[in-house]
Every structure is written in structure tokens, then in C-alpha cells.
Amino acid sequence: MARPGQRWLSKWLVAMVVLTLCRLATPLAKNLEPVSWSSLNPKFLSGKGLVIYPKIGDKLDIICPRAEAGRPYEYYKLYLVRPEQAAACSTVLDPNVLVTCNKPHQEIRFTIKFQEFSPNYMGLEFKKYHDYYITSTSNGSLEGLENREGGVCRTRTMKIVMKVGQDPNAVTPEQLTTSRPSKESDNTVKTATQAPGRGSQGDSDGKHETVNQEEKSGPGAGGGGSGDSDSFFNSKVALFAAVGAGCVIFLLIIIFLTVLLLKLRKRHRKHTQQRAAALSLSTLASPKGGSGTAGTEPSDIIIPLRTTENNYCPHYEKVSGDYGHPVYIVQEMPPQSPANIYYKV
């Protein structure tokens, strides 16, 4: 049987291997800058909203700030909508409510984790090279909290465009002139396509890249749909391949540790048997009678369980300790006729 120290070492090795595999399989995630959902937030640019480029594994916090002194509290209900809903500022059909900002004296924080597969049935799932939209059709007042048309989406362009897994520096100028604005693109795309010759000025203003990314996601592009499906398929294949490789490595390590423990156990058992065989009954036997024990029979030869320190046998002491009582091994002697026999006449 494996010793407790060996058992603890094997468990520690397995835990370290599992932790290492999890660290290798998990991409380098980061927490994006939180977004305060307020009409005073300057990040919501007119006609464009807020465009971010998260990667799989990143986290984004949307904060409903608490009421400030001297200003009325802004009531909002945030939705995850489709591109056409974001363009029309309408949440009438199939609304997906994310969070409701309706507690003036409390800061509400809603965290979005960009993951391709969610362990929760109601969790959000995102795909690479796809665009997702968050907006609100509330007007900021308590009476307009349940509005499904217009609201701050239309008046202040309060929307978040999330371009998952895309590169903000990837520029494709050809799409500005050949592609047609679709419902998935917002007002910035329409403005850019009206003046395609101002490409250099768009670069200097820092808006050119955002336009290209939004135009890239629209179905008007020639091979956009097939490219998205191919990239999604490739990402799924890569993910399953990584998971499969990790499982194979984990199984190989488990098999190696099992074989190692069996070898150690076999070696320990063989060593114990060799030491037990070396201790013969002749070397362990010691007569019970002695100088101070008169009247004892010579046949009562007692073999002590624990001999000298060099000939100590751990197996016999373990058995004796398990059963709780000392065990004596008595050598059998042939019966002898008594020396003194008296006959009554």
C-alpha cells in the first residue's frame, strides 16, 4: 500500500497539472474600461455611440450611477438588440433585457463576460467577428422607463457597439466605395459612404477605422456571410482541438502516475517480504524459563514479537497492534513422560 506521503505527492502533482492545463487553455483576458450609462458620459458620440473591440474572455462592466445632488436620477432599461433594432431604436419585438437602472440611491453594476459557451442556460454567448448592440429606448424619466421606441437611443445615440474578436486597426478602404449601407450599420457608415474621397481626413480624425469595421459586418459585403461562418467554424474546431489535446495529456499523466504508484507499492511489498523471511524462528526463539523463573516447563518457549533493534520486524508489530493483544508463538515439543511417578500399592 502506498504511504501517505506518496499519496499526498500524487494528488499534488495531479492538481498542478490540471491547473497548468487550465491556464494554458484560457486566453489572456482583461477587464475593459467600465461604461457609465448616463447622458453626461462623453463616450457616447453623436451619431455613432460607443464602439468597443472586446476579445473572447474579456469582461465589461456597465454601471448605473447613483443619483447626484442637484440632478434628477435617470431611469433606463438596457436591452441587447439586433442590428436592425439598434438602427431603428426599437425594442418592440423580442426584447432582451439586460439591466434596469431604477435605484437612485444605489450604484448598479452589470458585468458582461464575452464567452463563446456559457455554463448558465440564460447566460450570454458571443461569437468572434460578430457585432452586438446594447441600447435603451427609455427617455431617462420614470414615466418613460418602459418606452419601446426612440428614447435616448435616438436623441443622444446612447448605444454600445461591441465588435467581438475584431481588430480596430484593420482597414479595408475598398468596402467604403463598393459596399452599400445596410440596416446593420449605423449613421456613421452612411456619412462615410457619401464622401469616400475623404479617406485621409477620416484617418486623421480617428473615425475611419470604426466605419470600416461597421461596414465590414453588414450583409452588403460580397463574401461577408461566408467569411463569418468559416471563421466561426474554424474557431470551434480550434477550441475542440485544444480541449481534446488537453484531455489526452491529462489522461497520459494520470496513467503515468498510476504506473509509478504501482511500482512503488510493489517494491515496498517485496522489501517487506524479504525482511520477514530473514527472521527465522530459531533466531527469534528465546526460552521463557531462566534463572528467576523456577517451575516452568522447558517446552514453553516464547518467541517475542519485537526482538533487538536490528532484527525488528514491522509486520509482526503491525498485526499485534491491529488486534490489540500481544501474540505469542509457542514452539511445539514432543510429549515426554514425567520423571517422578508414584504408584499407590
From Swiss-Prot:
PROSITE patterns: EPHRIN_RBD_1 (PS01299), EPHRIN_RBD_2 (PS51551). InterPro entries: Cupredoxin, Ephrin, Ephrin-B_Ecto, Ephrin_CS, Ephrin_RBD. Residues 169-227 are annotated as: Disordered. Inducible phosphorylation of tyrosine residues in the cytoplasmic domain. One of its GO terms (biological process) is neural crest cell migration. GO terms for molecular function: ephrin receptor binding. It is found in: Cell membrane; Membrane raft. The modification Phosphoserine is found at residues 280, 286. Glycans are attached at residue 139. A motif (Nuclear localization signal) lies at residues 259-272. Belongs to the ephrin family. It is a single-pass type I membrane protein. Residues 1-24 form the signal peptide. Residues 258-345 are cytoplasmic. This is Ephrin-B1. Residues 204-217 have a biased composition (Basic and acidic residues). Residues 25-236 are extracellular. The chain crosses the membrane at residues 237-257.
